[in-house]
Amino acid sequence: MAINTSIPIKLNKGKDAVIISPYVEKWMVKSPAQNDSSQSYYGLGLPLSFIKTLKNNKWSIQSTLILRVNTESFNQKRVLQTGGQILLTYKASENFTYQFGLYANDELFGLFILPRIGIDWIINNRTNLFGLLPGNLNFEYRMSNYFYSGFMQYFFIIKYKI
């Protein structure tokens, strides 16, 4: 179960933005190794992003500070994790944008660094391919103005303090 939202605040006549994206989540895990007993894990997060469009409007840079807690109990010590991400975005055309960057997080086991690559491709007026790897990749087909279908691949890269 997860609840999240993104609150964009436009700046500089809409060219730049601050985005606040708080979330809360709860995971239930059942393990056959432990007689199918279930365990709950909780996550709270507050990503704060700033997007700056560069002079020629084809390039932009996004910097994100991420504060989060992933744990089975909020009574534990050292549950706050701090991290961040830098993404460069290049708009090759009206229909094709790609991204590359770096994610880093102060994990419970030490510094975790992950390269990122993304795509946002409007293949035609009904079909899109978009995502940021590793993380997610989406293929979307618009059947009508109200119905969409497609595929989504979500890669779990979440760690919890136990």
Where are these regions (language model features)?
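Hydrophobic alpha-helical segments and helix pairs
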Residues: 53-101
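Repeated loop/turn-to-beta-strand initiation elements of outer-membrane beta-barrel proteins
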Residues: 12-18, 56-61, 95-100, 126-129, ...
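Flexible, solvent-exposed coil segments and beta strand-coil junctions
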Residues: 25-30, 62-67, 94-98, 112-122, ...
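Outer-membrane beta-barrel translocator/channel fold
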Residues: 10, 22-44, 133-162
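Transmembrane beta-strands of outer-membrane beta-barrel pores
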Residues: 22-30, 52-54, 67-73, 104-108, ...
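Residues that define the transmembrane beta-barrel architecture of outer-membrane proteins
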Residues: 1-3, 38-44, 76-82, 111-115, ...
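Transmembrane beta-barrel domains of Gram-negative outer membranes and organellar outer membranes
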Residues: 1-72
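Residues on the lipid-exposed face of transmembrane beta-strands in outer-membrane beta-barrel proteins
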Residues: 3-9, 44-52, 84-90, 102, ...
